[in-house]
């Protein structure tokens, strides 16, 4: 009878090599992590991201004036605006190098969801430094609901793994919808255990 190799369930923190966080825009957007940008409709979430995307694409500066360095690639996935009549003109007005900004064409590839393997494939092929999903609600899929914490955690774990493995920052834009049935504090989070 062969000796069984016993797997340890626990890992000691003393066995972990500490590393530092790499920032795309300190202290707001970390590389290898998910960032949630949320606010009320009309607060300028998408506009702020368009400006950041433009600066990244041309190697400009972060909103606080720090140099980006080398121009970076970005995937900007937006379901709320037209690509040719709204998104591209906005990018151009912001001064983006549109050769460094891409999207998954939803006319060709319909039914895109947050845990869709096509997002991972696009990240592998394009190697962006930043991926923006705008808004997160449009990419949940019919069987997902951010109000159910377990489902939301599963989606976030997968996206977080992709961000870490492929060394990119992922920003999820979330528009708040305050409901009269919940307090302001719980309405903001959008995710609750049921």
Residue spans for each PLM region:
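Conserved inter-motif catalytic segment of the P-loop NTP-binding fold
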Residues: 3-4, 10-13, 19-20, 24-26, ...
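Gly/Ala-rich phosphate-binding loop of Rossmann-like dinucleotide-binding domains
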Residues: 57
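Phosphate-binding/switch region of NTP-binding enzymes
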Residues: 36, 42, 46-47, 77, ...
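Short, functionally important structural connectors and interaction interfaces within domains
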Residues: 16-17, 21, 183, 187
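Hydrophobic positions on the alpha1 helix immediately C-terminal to the Walker A/P-loop
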Residues: 48, 52
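Residue-level detector of intrinsically disordered, flexible termini
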Residues: 1, 121, 184-186
């Amino acid at each position: 009878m062969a000796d069984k190799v016993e797997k340890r369930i626990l890992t000691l923190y003393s066995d972990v090599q500490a590393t530092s966080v790499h920032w795309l825009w300190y202290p707001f957007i970390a590389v290898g992590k998910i960032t949630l940008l949320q606010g009320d409709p009309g607060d300028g979430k998408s506009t702020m991201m368009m400006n950041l995307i433009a600066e990244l694409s041309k190697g400009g500066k972060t909103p606080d004036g720090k140099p980006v360095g080398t121009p970076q690639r970005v995937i900007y996935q937006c379901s709320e605006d037209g690509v040719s009549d709204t998104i591209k003109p906005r990018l151009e007005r912001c001064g983006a190098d549109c050769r460094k900004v891409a999207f998954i064409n939803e006319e060709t590839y319909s039914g895109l969801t947050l845990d869709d393997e096509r997002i991972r494939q696009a990240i592998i092929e394009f190697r962006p430094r930043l991926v923006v999903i705008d808004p997160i609600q449009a990419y949940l899929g019919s069987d997902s609901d951010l109000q159910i914490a377990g489902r939301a955690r599963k989606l976030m774990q997968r996206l977080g793994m992709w961000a870490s493995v492929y060394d990119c920052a992922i920003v999820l834009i979330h528009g708040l919808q305050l409901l009269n049935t919940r307090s302001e504090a719980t309405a903001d989070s959008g995710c609750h255990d049921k």
